Swiss-Prot record:
<dbReference type="Pfam" id="PF03764">
    <property type="entry name" value="EFG_IV"/>
</dbReference>
<dbReference type="GO" id="GO:0003924">
    <property type="term" value="F:GTPase activity"/>
</dbReference>
<feature type="domain" description="tr-type G">
    <location>
        <begin position="8"/>
        <end position="282"/>
    </location>
</feature>
<feature type="binding site">
    <location>
        <begin position="135"/>
        <end position="138"/>
    </location>
    <ligand>
        <name>GTP</name>
    </ligand>
</feature>
<dbReference type="InterPro" id="IPR004540">
    <property type="entry name" value="Transl_elong_EFG/EF2"/>
</dbReference>
<dbReference type="InterPro" id="IPR000640">
    <property type="entry name" value="EFG_V-like"/>
</dbReference>
<feature type="region of interest" description="Disordered">
    <location>
        <begin position="285"/>
        <end position="304"/>
    </location>
</feature>
<dbReference type="GO" id="GO:0005737">
    <property type="term" value="C:cytoplasm"/>
</dbReference>
<dbReference type="GO" id="GO:0032790">
    <property type="term" value="P:ribosome disassembly"/>
</dbReference>
<keyword id="KW-0547">Nucleotide-binding</keyword>
<dbReference type="InterPro" id="IPR004161">
    <property type="entry name" value="EFTu-like_2"/>
</dbReference>
<dbReference type="InterPro" id="IPR047872">
    <property type="entry name" value="EFG_IV"/>
</dbReference>
<keyword id="KW-0342">GTP-binding</keyword>
<dbReference type="InterPro" id="IPR009022">
    <property type="entry name" value="EFG_III"/>
</dbReference>
<dbReference type="Pfam" id="PF00009">
    <property type="entry name" value="GTP_EFTU"/>
</dbReference>
<dbReference type="InterPro" id="IPR027417">
    <property type="entry name" value="P-loop_NTPase"/>
</dbReference>
<dbReference type="Pfam" id="PF03144">
    <property type="entry name" value="GTP_EFTU_D2"/>
</dbReference>
């Protein structure tokens, strides 16, 4: 089967935003207009095509990023709808990694909300070009221009409107295209018919003012255009469009469009903007990677002629076909039934079938090409972030980094049967979601599950019951404390055992030092002259890593350290991998005790919106929770208080806030960073762990 759409006419985009800004509704409308869905699904009916998990339909939010493909004006658009709730940031992270561009949806009333900032930072990290779509222009309090200035102020971006609205709230009638300087006026409710007309007289000055700003931004992308603009010459429509495309892909500015997805207004012009201004796979830099054996830098071009390379960005358990691996093809061609090499795991895998996903319907296809996003059946060993490639030209592509869980609960199966099923079910769920982890508590024997927030764990438990028919009792949420060290130390680990027959001998000297937050664990080998043979180096690292799971002070995992092995000795007969693993573990424990250990806790970024009269009480309450107020701002009749509060102080906050503000206060929080626990609280934590 030949390629249907040339690579230049492929667009891989994500739809990202704050919860309730209207992402899923926008995606639904896109699918409706591009002819993929014959009846529009509404989120509040629980019938949206992209929200296909039962939990999503009940809660009216998007949890997993559904991938679908659509066609518009001779282009293929692969769309990933991402969740806006902070507990599911991992889904946003992995989608952005495999996309070339994104549509950021903002609510015209709320503007830039906290999760918008988080998602924006994630997109900045991956250098993803964006279009901003200011949605819900028909809502009470809709203000397009306030939205634009918030994008500039809060996100530090450079928004350039390429459209402005005609009216707002219930008077929202259409949009003015600043490229063609024509008005698009909607004449029916479905938004499928619109008339092109001249700009209404009362908006001519405003349209000219914003067109001037657009021309200035466009001229800035190209020297020739700048000369033409400065000499007062008119830029042609084609020059303006090329300039917008260049500025968008070069991350110089963010084109801003507007509409009301629910009322079907502005969706087709948004699709036009995606096709015209978002990058094709050929417009983005080559994908970088390393050779699995030599570690040398390598790259792949976005072309069918290059050797095959792809990144698995999501694993999903499907009730009909089993394990589905979603992947993005960066180069080459892949046929179903063929073998691929998983260079991350060093294993060959056979692709059973290749499926093109359309939310929750699927279509089997014989092959995929560079730039495509598809799902494969049959990959047994592949997990999120793995590279799939041609074994004759192996490469490991840059993967993704996921945050550690910040909250955990103990779960107990209700019956013996549940116990047997629970292990398998949890393993399946952990395979799908890299921010969900589980372990068995060594002291109590309980199964502990960890995640990014209460909602995240609630949904995991819900899926255990629904999909896997496992009934379990759930404990109270606990904070995921961690430990770290504050100074560098050197320490020795020596394991010698002589008890008849072959003995055991492992001996090493290591230096451990603190790293910057979020660095994880680094293991460095500085052994020279073979004082420890090469095959025993990795076991030392494994021993250290295992010892790090139980910290010195209160038994919490230790994070952000570098361990360097620099000396040691071995015995020709008695040394073994196990002996050196134990020596590594002993050295770490000895060193960590002297390295000024500290307990650290997750600190959340909290944003509370309350009517002005409750401000004093809310701020006082935040301070009593060891909070640090960062700033305040007024929006209409409400005030927004921003600050950082330790997660351990936030349990039950929703109820307290409701009672303090008579149900009128709302808040959002997301994990921000780890911070050292004050001495008096750390002592309490240690005592509690010792008593437990």
């Amino acid at each position: 089967m030949a390629r249907q759409f040339p690579l230049e006419k492929t667009r891989n985009i994500g739809i990202m935003a704050h919860i309730d800004a209207g992402k899923t509704t926008t995606t639904e409308r896109i699918l409706f207009y591009t002819g993929r869905v014959h009846k529009i699904g509404e989120v509040h009916d629980g019938a949206a095509t992209m929200d296909w998990m039962v939990q999503e339909q009940e809660r009216g939010i998007t949890i997993t990023s559904a991938a679908t493909t659509a066609q518009w004006k001779g282009h293929r658009i692969n769309i990933i709808d991402t969740p806006g709730h902070v507990d599911f940031t991992v889904e946003v992270e992995r989608s952005l990694r495999v996309l070339d561009g994104a549509v950021a949806v903002f609510c015209s009333v709320g503007g830039v909300e906290p999760q918008s900032e988080t998602v924006w930072r994630q997109a900045d990290k991956y250098g993803v070009p964006r279009i901003a779509y200011i949605n819900k222009m028909d809502r009470m309090g809709a203000d397009f221009f306030r939205g634009v200035s918030m994008i500039a102020d809060r996100l530090g971006a450079n928004p350039v409107p390429i459209q402005i609205p005609i009216g707002a709230e219930d008077q929202f009638k259409g949009i003015i295209d600043l490229v063609t300087m024509k008005a698009m006026v909607y004449t029916d409710d479905l938004g499928t018919t619109s008339d092109t007309a001249d700009i209404p007289g009362d908006l001519v000055d405003q349209a000219n003012e914003y067109r001037e700003k657009l021309l200035e931004a466009v001229a800035d992308t190209d020297e020739e255009l700048m000369m033409k603009y400065l000499e007062g010459e008119e830029l042609t429509e084609e020059e303006i469009r090329n300039g917008i495309r260049k500025g968008t892909i070069g991350l110089k500015f963010i084109p801003v469009v507007c509409g009301s997805s629910f009322k079907n207004k502005g969706v087709q012009p948004l699709l036009d903007a995606v096709v015209e201004y978002m990058p094709a796979p050929t417009d983005v830099p080559n994908i970088k990677g390393v050779h699995p054996e030599t570690g040398e830098a390598d790259e792949r071009h976005s072309s069918d002629k290059d050797p095959f390379s792809a990144l698995a960005f999501k694993i999903m358990a499907d009730p009909y076909v089993g394990k589905l691996a979603f992947f993005r093809v960066y180069s080459g061609v892949l046929s179903s039934g063929s073998y691929v090499y998983n260079s991350t795991k060093g294993k060959r895998e056979r692709i059973g079938r290749i499926l093109q996903m359309h939310a929750n319907h699927r279509e089997e296809i014989p092959e995929v090409y560079a730039g495509d996003i598809a799902a494969a059946v049959g990959l047994k060993d592949t997990t999120t972030g793995d590279t799939l490639c041609d074994d004759k030209a192996p490469i490991i592509l840059e993967s993704m980094q996921f945050p550690d869980p910040v909250i955990n609960v103990a779960i107990e199966p209700k019956t013996k049967q549940d116990q047997e099923k629970m292990g398998t079910a949890l393993a399946r769920l952990a395979e799908e979601d890299p921010t969900f982890k589980m372990h068995t508590d060594q002291d109590s024997g309980q199964t502990i599950i960890e995640g990014m927030g209460e909602l995240h764990l609630e949904i995991i438990v819900d899926r255990l019951q629904r999909e896997f028919k496992v009934e379990c009792n759930v404990g109270r949420p606990q904070v995921a404390y961690k430990e770290t060290i504050r100074r560098a130390v050197k320490a020795e680990g020596k394991f010698v055992r002589q008890s008849g027959g072959r003995g055991q001998y492992g001996h090493c000297w290591i230096e451990i030092e603190p790293l910057e937050q979020g660095s994880g664990f680094e293991f460095v080998n500085k052994i020279v002259g073979g004082v420890i043979p090469r095959e025993y180096i990795a076991p030392i690292g494994q021993g250290i890593e295992e010892a790090m799971q139980n910290g010195i002070q209160a038994g919490y995992p230790v994070m952000d350290i570098r361990a360097t092995v620099y000396d040691g000795s071995y015995h020709d007969v008695d040394s073994s991998e196990m002996a050196f693993k134990i020596a590594g573990s002993m050295a770490f424990k000895a060193g960590a005790a002297k390295a000024d250990p500290a307990i650290i806790e997750p600190v959340m970024k909290v944003e509370v919106t309350v009517p002005e009269e409750y401000m004093g009480e809310v701020i006082g309450d935040m301070n009593s929770r060891r909070g640090r107020i960062e700033g305040m701002e007024a929006t209409g009749t409400a005030q927004i208080v921003r600050g950082f509060v330790p997660l351990s102080e936030m349990f039950g906050y929703a109820t307290d806030l409701r009672s303090k503000t008579q149900g009128r206060g709302v808040y959002v929080m997301m994990f921000d960073h780890y911070e050292e626990v004050p001495k008096n609280i750390a002592e309490g934590i240690v005592a509690k762990r010792a008593g437990a």
